[in-house]
């Protein structure tokens, strides 16, 4: 199973894809191992700890106790004490689950001080010795039903009854429109249009020099509507519990957020390609607020309908309010520290009175920043600061007053994970233990820092999306009489909302937008207008920046055409500048920047074996090069022993080296990240005495029309058109 080109090379699925750090599980935790997958045991072992068998709904016993106007069932396991009005099949499932629990280890009873406003609780089970980051971290010990009932005994019932006051169903609520009051005929028409790629689009401008493209299924009688801006959280349809706290932490929206929030909270898909250090926290708070709002509304709808069914056991009510499994929100993140930041947003917005296993979470997910990185760029410190391990997963379960970390996936409301962490539990190497049913009912999928995921192994992200909203292989205690019709009709992927945030957009991210974001409510893409990275070069003297276009008939043929152009045109001039008379080598100081690892291997092998380059001395640094070999290559290049140095984009992404001795730069392809252009060109000025000479050597970059997206970020939106279509010449220079 090969990874995408240039994103880790041809590697097995469980390899990080050449990731340059986190080799020991990131700072702050040991490397996780996966010998005891409790998710996998859900299908094979029949353990009482599975947690996937529900009493005819997505919610378990603890949640049922929180239903308004609903009498609390007994904590006894004796079937004689069961509620007489329950359905026989559901009662049987409860008895079966209780029988299993009876044979398991004794559960520890907890006592909580309900007079305390906030309590952090550590619940240790028989597997707590595995807390150092095993697979069980995302499917950890659950509290027993007896404990959950004990927790609720002292809760005033008037609190339960009034919790949802003011939260009555609103026909104008996007939640009701998108999930509950669904016109099956219109839904089918929209799905048919999407399946035939029948989208109608509208383009407009957004504040901050952003471009908005809104798309909706092209159905008869429906046109695209530009949604009015939303000024603040007071204008959102929030649960009262969230509305009470959101205003304290989310200030009045700026002009950009005001324009995008209506689409986010209106359950439309969003691809936002202008994520920055300054707006990342705001959008993180917004998508966490949206996810919490969705979880609470889903949960309360199920509880209210449970109450109705208990009050009217003989009625023919058809209350379809849930999916096949409980998890409703999936948040995909690049590192454990990014997960910590998301949890900080969730807790400040939800304001739980208790947080179970919070200390364990911080011990295994959080770490201090490396002091040696103080000189690193801000974007580097944001991504790799703290615990930068990229293999993790975490289940979150919400009750009325509690957030439970490390809940079993099938008992969780929200799953936070890295693509690699999810894939390790979804698809075992032996192929015998596969489990992705917990993704069958995801209704909101969020991808943050998608550009960072590209530098890990994008194939893992594609794999996760390919397994979202599939029909489950097992029932997991599902009450099919409560499952929404569009789940049963295998239409869930057309109802799911996907929110993707990235610093820039690439063909891979565009492919995700085109093929996986198929929301019947519509989708929008927000992209910046670029001035060009060539205007922001950190050198005291002007630098000649030359772009050479080569012909390429298709993306498939582009690598071959690029290599042919390099060896026939660029390399010949490189050899002339790197060798003296008679072929004797001389110091050149030429850095060849290569975005793709596969291209790096091809060029390295060519330079080492071709008769054309027999007198050319070179070194090579890739994301797989050892620290010792990196130091040797840098030393030889700086001293002039090597006249050429090969350097990959992913190496720069993970390490941000400052390469000294650079006098001229050849870009085999321009970088995806526009920040890298200025940083790499800045190598020319690391030796002040030779800055003028290096500026004269300048930069030469190769490109084709298939590089349009990243070329736009480098040369600017206005310049790009002529450079791609100019017929009078294929070389463009800027000073």
UniProtKB/Swiss-Prot annotation:
Question: In what ranges is there compositional bias, type Basic and acidic residues?
Answer: 38-47, 113-127
Q: Where in the cell is it found?
A: Nucleus, Nucleolus
Query: Which parts of this chain are annotated as the region Disordered?
Result: 1-173
Keyword annotations from UniProtKB, A to Z: Nucleus, Ribonucleoprotein, Ribosome biogenesis, rRNA processing
- In which residue ranges is the amino acid composition biased (Basic residues)? 18-30
Question: Which Pfam families would you find in this protein's record?
Answer: Utp25_C, UTP25_NTPase-like
Protein task: DEAD-box RNA helicase-like protein required for pre-18S rRNA processing, specifically at sites A0, A1, and A2.
Q: How does it assemble?
A: Component of the ribosomal small subunit (SSU) processome composed of at least 40 protein subunits and snoRNA U3.
Q: Which gene encodes it?
A: UTP25
Please give the biological process terms from Gene Ontology that the record holds. Answer: maturation of SSU-rRNA from tricistronic rRNA transcript (SSU-rRNA, 5.8S rRNA, LSU-rRNA)
Endpoints of the signal sequence: none
Compositionally biased, Acidic residues: which spans? 59-69, 138-157
An MF annotation (GO) of this entry: U3 snoRNA binding
GO CC annotation: nucleolus; small-subunit processome
UniProt name for this protein: U3 small nucleolar RNA-associated protein 25
Specify the superkingdom.
Answer: Eukaryota
Q: Which family does it belong to?
A: Belongs to the UTP25 family.
Q: Which organism is it from?
A: Paracoccidioides brasiliensis (strain Pb18)
